[in-house]
Swiss-Prot record:
GO molecular function, one term: tRNA (guanine(37)-N1)-methyltransferase activity
UniProt organism field: Rhodopseudomonas palustris (strain TIE-1)
Disordered: annotated segments: 227-248
Recorded family membership: Belongs to the RNA methyltransferase TrmD family.
Gene that specifies this protein: trmD
Record's subcellular location: Cytoplasm
Any one Pfam family match given in the protein's UniProt record, by short name: tRNA_m1G_MT
Name of the protein in question: tRNA (guanine-N(1)-)-methyltransferase
Binding site for S-adenosyl-L-methionine: 113, 133-138
EC number of this enzyme: 2.1.1.228
GO CC term, one of those recorded: cytosol
Subunit composition and interactions: Homodimer.
InterPro entries reported in the protein's UniProt record: Alpha/beta_knot_MTases (IPR029028), tRNA_m1G_MeTrfase_C_sf (IPR023148), tRNA_m1G_MeTrfase_TrmD (IPR002649), tRNA_m1G_MTases_N (IPR029026), tRNA_MeTrfase_TRMD/TRM10 (IPR016009)
Amino acid sequence: MTWRATVLTLFPEMFPGPLGVSLAGRALASGLWGLEARDIRDSATDRHRSVDDTPAGGGPGMVLRADVLAAAIDAVDAAADRPRLVMSPRGRPLTQARVAELAAGPGPLIVCGRFEGIDQRVIDARGLEEVSIGDYVLSGGEIAAMALIDACVRLLPGVMGKLESSTDESFSAGLLEYPQYTRPQTFEGRAIPEVLLSGDHGKVAAWRLGEAEALTKARRPDLWAARPAQTIRAKGESQKTPKNKTDG
């Protein structure tokens, strides 16, 4: 079964957007994954196609109605084991581990909120998993949904050129990725570290592991504190050859 993402949104014209180019776009055109963007307004029942109303208890903005959104969700032929997600800054942070789980499944149903948010009752009644891509607020969930989908698509079989491309990246073993270099050998007086040109695979692996650990300690102490030490060490010892990697 082809991995498929179904997006419920007020702006289906935003899709595929950036998902239609580069790795994700080529894979989409090749049938390695599928994408469906559905307009939430199609589930509205009044002549104005209303989808929102004022917040109960007062306050600014508008809230997406539970009845309309529930109808939109129910109109999707979703398998019982298909994840139902809603992009929300109050959700659990999206991690590479969760991305891998989603990529290994049938593909998610993703609800994109707008306005002041979504009526909590539909989140509870339809078992929506709230997911956040960071501690900031966007105008809607569409861009966040694209980020989640792109992260998943890269892990699907046949999408990446080399299996090692995804296993060496940031977060794959609890570390940020080590620095990458390519030609020219010297750029504005800055040379490629000699160890990367040595041909000694063991030294290259040790250097990369050391750089990844140093970057993680400095920039993401939370990741460093939670890292699986044995897994990281094994990863460093198993790395073989230098490589170049692009997503474009």
